[in-house]
Each structure stands twice: as C-alpha cells, then as structure tokens.
Amino acid sequence: QLNNQYPGTYFGMIISKMQSKNPLVSHLYFDDIDFTDQCIIRSSLLPNRIQTYFQTHSNWPNSKYGFHDAIDVIMDYAKVNEKVAEFCMYNMLDGFYNTGQTDKKNNPIWGELCDYIMNEYIFGEGCGDDIEPSDLLKERASQFKNLQVGSVPPNFSILDIQKSII
C-alpha cells in the first residue's frame, strides 16, 4: 500500500516488503525481495525477515537441523550479491551468538549454528566460487570462534589494583 503511495522510492520498496507475501510457504518466503539490490542491507528489512523466517520455518526444537536448513535457504537467496550475502552471514552469526549469550539454558545449538555459518559459508565453499567473504568478515568470524568455550581467547590487557597494566 505504501509502495503505491510512494512508487519507485526506497521507502516504499522497503516498507512494502517488511512482511512476506508468502509467510507460511518456506520456499517462497523471500521471493518478493530483490537480493541483487544491495540497498536492502541499509534497512531493517533483512534482519526482520530473517528472524521471522527462523521463528516460522526452523521447526526448532522439533527438528534438529531446522535452523541449518533455514540458513541454507537464506544463503541461496543472498549469494546472488556479495554484499547482501556477507550482510546475511554476519547478521545470522551475530544473532545466534547473542542468543547463545542470553540463553538461560546454555543450549549448545547457538554455538553450533555459529560454527555452521563460519565453516560452511565464511571459511568454506557454501556460497560457491562467486562469493569471497571479505577479510573484515573473516576477522569478525575468527573473533567469534576465539570467544567460544574451549578456544584460546585473544590477548588482552587489564589494570591490576595498583592501576598497572597486566
């Protein structure tokens, strides 16, 4: 409706796509978004739609690999544009990491999903030969990896009680 009021504008395009035209059909959920248009990363469109997609179509906790399948669907759409793909990878990685940090049950799935995104898409070949994640994304992913339980944390400095750096 707003797209009709403001045809051809960024505002109209983004607002008109905030909700899927096919909210209950997983393989059509993102069909109304033009993933080749990298301007979609400058709004809350993708984070909102990705989160709603996970909530609606991951079937978690009933399906052990529901989130993995959902990640793959999102990346199949996103990989048509390198910047959009990178935005989606980081958005999902950050979302799962932060969910894991606040999960009172300490469910290991959140860390496993971070590993899946890093191993399959950021450091792996999940996007094919056309998408090469930037050094910045690889560095951020490495920082996520270093913060996981069992990993060697990065070097850091703190002040002792005498205010000396240790």
Positions of predicted regions on the chain:
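Oxidative protein folding and maturation machinery
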Residues: Q1-I161
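Short active-site neighborhood of thiol/selenol oxidoreductases, capturing the structured segment around
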Residues: I166
